[in-house]
Regions:
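Thiamine diphosphate
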Residues: 1-134, 139
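Structural signature of the thiamine diphosphate
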Residues: 145-153
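Short aromatic/hydrophobic contact patches that present stacked aromatics
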Residues: 142
């Protein structure tokens, strides 16, 4: 019985939020669709008192903007906390100035991105990598997952 595996059916947002929660001490959030769900999970788990891998409840700070969330991540990292955030499309573009600072100072963090098309004349909400590709020059290492399992791993 000790070798019994536990399987969970979930979507990519839950998988990314679960891992982010386990490995973070602080989450700076600002809701932007389709990544809002990840931040909502983390906020809910913190409110319930769920502990991360370090035996602590993750501190969640909801900011006034995407740029504010990135700035809070930067400040938290400089203070030594393992910090994460969640974003998508235009929100990620607003984080680029802080991403340069974070990468330049070699501070360890993860930005969980729900890749989505950027707003244009067509206002597409479909999956796309324009947002992520706009950040490739910041100095961040980028990993992408092709499935929910890869997001969890």
């Amino acid at each position: 019985m000790a070798n019994e595996k536990k399987f969970v059916t979930c979507d990519g947002n839950w998988a990314a939020a679960h891992i982010a929660y386990l490995f973070s001490e602080h989450a700076a959030i600002y809701p932007i669709t389709p990544s809002s769900t990840m931040a909502e999970y983390v906020d809910e788990w913190a409110a319930q008192g769920k502990k991360n891998l370090f035996g602590e409840v993750v501190k969640v700070t909801e900011m006034q903007s995407e740029g504010g969330a990135a700035g809070a991540v930067h400040g938290s990292l400089q203070a030594g906390a393992l910090t994460t955030t969640f974003t998508a499309s235009q929100g990620l573009l607003l984080m680029i100035p802080n991403m340069y600072k974070i990468a330049g100072e070699m501070l360890p963090t993860v930005f969980h991105v729900s890749a989505r098309a950027l707003a244009s004349h067509a206002l597409s909400i479909f999956g796309d990598h324009q947002d992520v590709m706009a950040c490739r020059q910041t100095g961040y290492a980028m990993l992408a997952s092709a499935s929910v399992q890869e997001a969890l791993d």
